[in-house]
Amino acid sequence: MAADPTELRLGSLPVFTRDDFEGDWRLVASGGFSQVFQARHRRWRTEYAIKCAPCLPPDAASSDVNYLIEEAAKMKKIKFQHIVSIYGVCKQPLGIVMEFMANGSLEKVLSTHSLCWKLRFRIIHETSLAMNFLHSIKPPLLHLDLKPGNILLDSNMHVKISDFGLSKWMEQSTRMQYIERSALRGMLSYIPPEMFLESNKAPGPKYDVYSFAIVIWELLTQKKPYSGFNMMMIIIRVAAGMRPSLQPVSDQWPSEAQQMVDLMKRCWDQDPKKRPCFLDITIETDILLSLLQSRVAVPESKALARKVSCKLSLRQPGEVNEDISQELMDSDSGNYLKRALQLSDRKNLVPRDEELCIYENKVTPLHFLVAQGSVEQVRLLLAHEVDVDCQTASGYTPLLIAAQDQQPDLCALLLAHGADANRVDEDGWAPLHFAAQNGDDGTARLLLDHGACVDAQEREGWTPLHLAAQNNFENVARLLVSRQADPNLHEAEGKTPLHVAAYFGHVSLVKLLTSQGAELDAQQRNLRTPLHLAVERGKVRAIQHLLKSGAVPDALDQSGYGPLHTAAARGKYLICKMLLRYGASLELPTHQGWTPLHLAAYKGHLEIIHLLAESHANMGALGAVNWTPLHLAARHGEEAVVSALLQCGADPNAAEQSGWTPLHLAVQRSTFLSVINLLEHHANVHARNKVGWTPAHLAALKGNTAILKVLVEAGAQLDVQDGVSCTPLQLALRSRKQGIMSFLEGKEPSVATLGGSKPGAEMEI
């Protein structure tokens, strides 16, 4: 029996059939030229992705089948951590069996998730690594279909690219056929302008660089390029030098994102020769990812809005308050309004039936007379058995109005006639809340004597004791705690009265509440204690009393920040000193890994750096991605901060996770004085990071002649190769910066010879 012709052409490439997989094939992606199914292998119990070409029927032409097989064979040979693995071909149906990527394509993720900056940068960097690998193959393998749909993400959101096989299509198609086919495949936006302008030129590596730039734009903005434009409009715009809008680019983005935008612009340059190669791109994306990962997130100070009733007083001296007047004016009975306004002047205060009715806004004569402060007239009206607890449309009872207006006689009169001391308005405020807000201990005592709930909580959970603590009314607070008010009740965000008193720095209230059993370390929802709030606001006396009373100086909030972290980040020298005296830890890390010294270095607080150093803080403490305080200072701080840390004993040669030393960062940032300072403290000029770059490589890449001269004088060698055999000399030549070129020509006569041999030729594809 003759062998299957397909098998004859497969060589060592494994062949699968539908029977090798379980019956349930799940469609996970579909495009104009292919469908991707998820299927489980029967024996291996492993999930695979099977990319089928619905345009190729079972009796497809042998050339089409051969193309698919050739493509699979080519892809299977390529082994790299950021390129999807190929396991073989499927005969029935015809397709390629490949590694299953749990999170699907970047295209799908961008449309359904908001990605953090760190993840966006990592995807950009890993994509550049994959493309650099393809371009470094001999001969270079061009992708020619780089787009979010072909950037796949595994279960940990790491990148693997697929579908780098369009070169055959291009060889077999006319330019117009290729463009039309690209439009159908949804990749027109990723085609560079030279493809529209130069009819005979074959695509080169810079084609992929342009496509990569559009991918960067999509990742940064999470939008679709050229949305709303038809095929011809896109071609015309791109050919004319126009690109996706930069309007979404925001000044609020981190500085590293602004630098990524600069890289993106260079990658989509109209002139292919001016676009960087992927080797250079990986250098920049690695730098930017490393810098972004070291960013310090200091929790923002959240102002505590002063709690007040949302209602204005219904009575103003000598006249009817505007609110109550407006409610009366809004009534649908103008005649009644006139009668009601005359009540205070009438000797006969017995109202007619129509005057006792409730109107649209539910304001009654009793509300009006209470707002007027007319005790005797209210007494006469109450004698006619009116509803003493009648409520306006906003829930106001006469007693609430009297309490808000600080009318103790009216409150007593209304309570004597059975007014409910716990009836609340629409915001949940009881009369006792108003008395506490006003510091009216007389009315508060009267209300409590008539059954007012001492721990009544309004809609957002505030009690009268919270309000007394906020407004520094010790008289009311003492009355409330004498009536067993609970000092540990939490409002909606978790604040106790002690949180409120500490935030506003009301020392007398802090002392009173702590003496009455308030929990010193009670936590809000964000886990902040009263001490956190007092430190954040700089309330020294409140801090002092809390610490004396036994508050824990190292309590951590939801970001892992203790009071000392906050004080160090905000430059509160005296508070730092006080916290250290009460035993605050110098080495507690936040969730990002930052110690108080990291934060002081990041913010540039020199006094606090010296204080922490004198207190024996670890100058080499490792934070996020193993950055020391000196790394943060070299990257973000002023030269004086770098100098202070070095004087205090910081190690100038500490290497972070990717091998970057403070000298690398100072060179990358072009801070000349920091470079000098680090070298004077014996920074290693030959230090190499994980990809083999020395500080001299970075100086050459940045085109900074002054710093490169200093490094050379300190012994830097210009012929040291990095991980891809590139020297600072070669980077300098490729940067084409005149100052660097002039310096090198004078410093190193052999540069001309090196230039003649095209030092970057093996990388510049």
Curated annotation (Swiss-Prot):
Residues bound to ATP: 28-36, 51
Keyword list, A-Z: ANK repeat, ATP-binding, Kinase, Nucleotide-binding, Repeat, Serine/threonine-protein kinase, Transferase
Protein family: Belongs to the protein kinase superfamily. TKL Ser/Thr protein kinase family.
One Pfam match: Ank_2
PANTHER family per record: ANKYRIN REPEAT AND PROTEIN KINASE DOMAIN-CONTAINING PROTEIN, ANKYRIN REPEAT AND PROTEIN KINASE DOMAIN-CONTAINING PROTEIN 1
Active site residues according to the UniProt entry: 145 (proton acceptor)
Reported effect, residue 347 to T: In a breast infiltrating ductal carcinoma sample; somatic mutation
A single Gene Ontology CC term: cell projection
InterPro entries: Ankyrin_rpt, Ankyrin_rpt-contain_sf, Kinase-like_dom_sf, Prot_kinase_dom, Ser-Thr/Tyr_kinase_cat_dom, Ser/Thr_kinase_AS
Domain Protein kinase: 22-289
GO biological processes: cellular response to retinoic acid; regulation of cell cycle process
Protein name in UniProt: Ankyrin repeat and protein kinase domain-containing protein 1
Domain of life per record: Eukaryota
Catalytic function, reaction form: L-seryl-[protein] + ATP = O-phospho-L-seryl-[protein] + ADP + H(+); L-threonyl-[protein] + ATP = O-phospho-L-threonyl-[protein] + ADP + H(+)
Effect of residue 717 to L: In a lung large cell carcinoma sample; somatic mutation
UniProt xrefs under Gene3D superfamilies: Ankyrin repeat-containing domain (1.25.40.20), Transferase(Phosphotransferase) domain 1 (1.10.510.10)
